Amino acid sequence: FVDRNRIPRSNNGPKIPIISNP
């Protein structure tokens, strides 16, 4: 899935979590 608080790369790929909302 794709979080608006994360930079989508791949479903099984690396993701960069951006903590903005709980």
UniProtKB/Swiss-Prot annotation:
Function as written in the Swiss-Prot or TrEMBL entry: Antibacterial peptide active against Gram-positive bacterium M.luteus and Gram-negative bacterium E.coli.
Organism encoding this protein: Calliphora vicina
Keyword terms, alphabetized: Antibiotic, Antimicrobial, Immunity, Innate immunity, Secreted
Any single GO BP term: innate immune response
GO cellular component: extracellular region
Region listing for Disordered, in residue ranges: 1-22
Main subcellular localisation: secreted
Induction summary: By bacterial infection.
Location in the cell: Secreted
Name by which UniProt lists this protein: Proline-rich peptide
